[in-house]
Amino acid sequence: MTILGTTFGMVFYLLQVVSGESGYAQNGDFEDAELDDYSFSCYSQLEVDGPQHLLSCAFEDPDVNSTNLEFEICEGLLEVKCLNFSKLQETYFIKTKKFLLIGDSTICVKLGGKHITCQKLNIVKRVKPEAPFDVKVIYREEANEFVVTFNTSHLQKKYVKDLLHEVVYRLEKNENDWMHVNISSTKLTLLQRKLQPNAMYEIKVRSIPNTNYFEGFWSEWSPSSHFRTPENNSGKMDPVLLIISIVSFFSVALMVILACVLWKKRIKPIVWPSLPDHKKTLEQLCKKPKKNLNVSFNPESFLDCQIHKVDGIQARDEAEAFLQDTFPPQLDDSEKQRLGGGVQGLNWPSQHAVITPKTFGGESPLRCLSGSVTVCDVPVIPSSRPPDCREGGKNGPHVYQGLLLGAGTTNSTLPHLFPFQSGILTLNPAVQGQPLFTSLGSSQEEAYVTMSSFYQNQ
C-alpha cells in the first residue's frame, strides 16, 4: 500500500508540473494565465469565395504561446449565436456566409473553456481588400508615355466595389525613394519626361475601401512589375515638327519682307494716313511777297488786251431781251404759204438790212433819234447773204437782214414779215444822234474782263 500511494503521488506531481508549463491552470489557478498579453487584431474579407466571407484574427505579440488558445465570435450572426475559429499556424480564421454585416460582434480568446479577453468590432469597418494582380506596363512611343494597368477581384463583387488604389514606383537602385500616385481606376499614365532615360523601374499596387459604409485597411501589395525606359532621343527631331518649323520661318520672313517693301506705298497710307501740315499752309498765306513780282496793276500793261466796258455789256443784254420780246418767232411753212402772195414781191428784193436806234431803258422801242421824220435816218448796209446767214469778222457788225421800213411810216414798229435769225440788233448811243453798231451774237466779241495772274508760291 505504501508503494502504491507513493506512485500516485509522483504521478500527480508530474501532471501538475506539466500543466503549469503549458499555461493551463487548474483548481482555480487562473491568475497566472492572466499575466500574459493576449491582445489581438482582426480583419474581414467579403465575398472571398462566392457568398462566403472571411474573418481572420492574430495575436499582436508573436511570442504568445497559442497552443491551447481558441477564438470565438458571438453576436452579429445569422441562425447561430456563436462560432469558433479555425487555426492555421499563427492565424485564426473563420469562413462563413452567416455574418449579418450589421452591428457589432464580440470576439473572445478562450483558454480551457474560459474567456481570457474579448473585443467588440464591426466587420464592415475592418475590411481588407484582396491584393491587386496582373500589373502591366506598356510603352506608347507615339505619345512618349507609359500606361500602367492592373486588375482586382473587387470589380465583380457586390459589396466592396469602390476602391482607392495606391501605385508606387521607384528606380531599382533607390530602395526607399518611392513615388506615390493615388487613383480610383485601374489605369495610370506615366509621362516619359518625368522618368529617367534608360533606367529600370519597379512598380506595385495596393487597395483600400473608398466608401462611407465599408472601411478598413490597405490590402497587401501586388507582385512587383519592372519596366525599362528608352534612351533619350533629344538629339533627334520629329520630321513633321521640322517641316512645320521651316514653313513657319519662311512665312514669317516673307511677311516681313513684304511689309518692308509695301510700307510706304500701301501699308502706311492705310494705317497712318498723312494729314496736311497747317503750319506750312499758314506760312504760305502769311508770307510776305517777294520784291520782284510779275504782278502789275499798271493800265499800260493791258494795252495789248481788248477791254470792254461794263456799260456796253449791260446795253447788249437789254437789247437781246427787247428783241426777243418784240419780234415773233419764225413762221412755219403753212404761214409762209398763207402769206406767200404778199411775200413773193418782198422776197429779199434788195437784200438790205435796216438798223434802227433804240433808247435803252425807255418806253418806246425802235424810235428815231430825230423825233418827227417820216423815215428814220439810218444807214442801209447791202448784203448778199440769205436771211439765215450773218457776216463774220472782227470789225464787221452783225445785224438782222431783211428788216424793211415801208415809206410813209413814222415812228412805227417794224412789220413782222420775216423771222429773225440768231443775229441781234444793238445800238450803243454813245453820241446823241449817231448810232453805234455792236456785235451781240459772236463769242469772239463777248465782253470779258482780264485780270492779272495770281501769284503762285513756288
From Swiss-Prot:
InterPro entries: FN3_7, FN3_dom, FN3_sf, Hempt_rcpt_S_F1_CS, Ig-like_fold. GO terms for molecular function: cytokine receptor activity. Residues 261-458 are cytoplasmic. The chain crosses the membrane at residues 240-260. It is a single-pass type I membrane protein. Glycans are attached at residues 84, 182. A motif (Box 1 motif) lies at residues 271-279. Keywords: Cell membrane, Disulfide bond, Glycoprotein, Membrane, Phosphoprotein, Receptor, Signal, Transmembrane, Transmembrane helix, Ubl conjugation. GO terms for biological process: cytokine-mediated signaling pathway; hemopoiesis; positive regulation of receptor signaling pathway via JAK-STAT. Residues 131-232 form the Fibronectin type-III domain. Residues 1-20 form the signal peptide. It is found in: Cell membrane. Disulfide bonds join 42-57, 74-82, 108-118. Residues 21-239 are extracellular. One of its GO terms (cellular component) is external side of plasma membrane. N-glycosylated IL-7Ralpha binds IL7 300-fold more tightly than the unglycosylated form. The IL7 receptor is a heterodimer of IL7R and IL2RG. The TSLP receptor is a heterodimer of CRLF2 and IL7R. Interacts with CD53. The WSXWS motif appears to be necessary for proper protein folding and thereby efficient intracellular transport and cell-surface receptor binding. Belongs to the type I cytokine receptor family. Type 4 subfamily. Receptor for interleukin-7. Also acts as a receptor for thymic stromal lymphopoietin (TSLP). This is Interleukin-7 receptor subunit alpha. It comes from Equus caballus. The gene is IL7R.
